[in-house]
Amino acid sequence: MPVFLNQPIAHRFGKYLLDELAAERWSRFQAAVAWVRRSGTRHLMPTLRAFLQGGGEIRLIVGVDIAHTSFEGLEDLLSLATYGSATTHVFHNEDSAVFHPKLYLLSNATAARLVVGSNNITESGLYTNTEVALMIDDTPQSKVVIDAEASFDSWRDPLHGISTQEFSC
């Protein structure tokens, strides 16, 4: 059954995300967000590092349009590669509209949890803004999860007319 996350009234998305990553249920974490700032990454970094050190995989896509992503926040995410299997793709395309998704996917071999909402990886997006998200549990083979995976893949693929680059520290 889908769950509606209403921040800050009932949930803080940052706490929810930290709890999910620390639960040791998931082997892969993917996210695509419009903006990331150190104000957000400082809350997530210890748990993201532990997730990687426990054998998890992280694949991130971050937009840099409209100057809302900070260098420091991006640098934090890029540094994750030193702790395990982590990639960060930077999305920037001067010829198109702003990259603006907020899509999170936690998965393992038998289960997937998709979260679609308005939360960026900023302190305000994770904790203080009025934000909403819809959480859907399904299998990795379900149509909605396959469609989400296809979206992640297309945003990482420069052959689809999208300017992306994978960075590492």
List PLM regions with ranges.
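PLD/PLD-like phosphodiesterase catalytic module centered on the HKD motif
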Residues: 1-169
